[in-house]
UniProtKB/Swiss-Prot annotation:
Protein name: Transposable element Tcb2 transposase
Ranges that cross the membrane: none
Biological function: Probably essential for transposable element Tcb2 transposition.
Keyword Nucleus: yes
UniProt subcellular location: Nucleus
Keyword DNA-binding: yes
Domain of life, per lineage: Eukaryota
Length: 273
């Protein structure tokens, strides 16, 4: 019975104690109590934890991630000095997106077996777009409508490009992920027309993008701060974004070799970053 309890949990870490209790029940044995199930799992080192949410990555993209990480493993802060990292992010007005639990051994939070795979989605919150370089932060841009290629072009033309040219210089290199609207013919033509160089970027690689650390920084500072409407929430986000010190930027750019090495060590699977 004890071995079955542990086996069922290892086969599906998202099973609750109640589910496991029902699965291991047999006609010829006494049904274990929930307390017994939980105790056996804890004895086996399987404690209830919140899973790390990471994207599911295809084999092709894992190979590409490792190749990119190896190519940039020894880049230092100066190598990234003329690069502009970008991304958009969603912040809830209040509440959460829901909490799921899994059982896993200590120290295995980022093991793919114990991660909760996610897909991008929108709705019901404040969406923002931002970018930064090694010398400056751009003005945070609020996204009020559906983020299509035309909205993205407006952001590039009227927010990103003027800021990048004035703070980084004309020879900046722009980073973006491979979202379809970013790679559409319409946007590719904009980059060609405006003579903007792009950083080759592996798909499904938010953990390689240092701007993710900035989104986490903003989230930590606004979490628990109530906003009565979307305008107030955006004001909160903007205040935190503008207050990020350049020492934080230096730190996350210095983390790039570690990010690359971690991706290599993980064979392209999602990492802790």
């Amino acid at each position: 019975m004890d071995r079955n309890i542990v086996r069922v949990s290892r086969e599906d870490p998202q099973r609750s104690s109640t589910d496991i209790q029902m699965v291991v029940k047999t006609p010829n044995e006494v049904t274990p109590s929930l307390r017994t199930v939980r105790r056996r799992l804890q004895d086996a080192g399987l404690h209830g934890r919140r899973p790390a949410k990471k994207p599911s990555i295809s084999k092709k993209n894992r190979i590409a991630r490792v190749a990119w990480a190896r190519a940039h493993l020894h880049w230092g802060r100066q190598d990234w000095a003329n690069h502009v990292f970008s991304d958009e992010s969603k912040f809830n007005l209040f509440g959460t997106d829901g909490i799921k639990w899994i059982r896993r051994p200590v120290g295995c939070r980022f093991d793919p077996s114990y991660q909760l795979q996610t897909v991008k989605h929108g709705g019901g919150s404040v969406m923002v777009w931002g970018c930064f370089s090694g010398t400056s932060m751009d003005p945070l841009r609020r996204i009020d409508s559906i983020m299509d290629r035309f909205v993205y072009e407006d952001i590039l033309e009227n927010t990103m490009r003027p800021w990048a040219r004035s703070t980084v210089g004309r020879a900046f290199v722009f980073q973006q992920d491979n979202d379809p609207k970013h790679t559409s013919k319409h946007i590719k033509e904009w980059f060609r027309r405006r003579h903007v160089d792009l950083l080759d970027w592996p798909s499904q690689s938010p953990d390689l993008n240092p701007i993710e650390h900035l989104w986490e920084h903003v989230e930590r500072h606004v979490r628990g701060v109530r906003a009565s409407n979307a305008n107030q929430k955006f004001d909160q986000l903007q205040d935190v974004w503008q207050a990020i010190p350049m020492s934080v930027i230096d730190t996350i750019l210095d983390s790039m070799p570690r990010r690359c090495q971690t991706v290599i060590d993980a064979k392209g699977f999602p990492t802790k970053y």
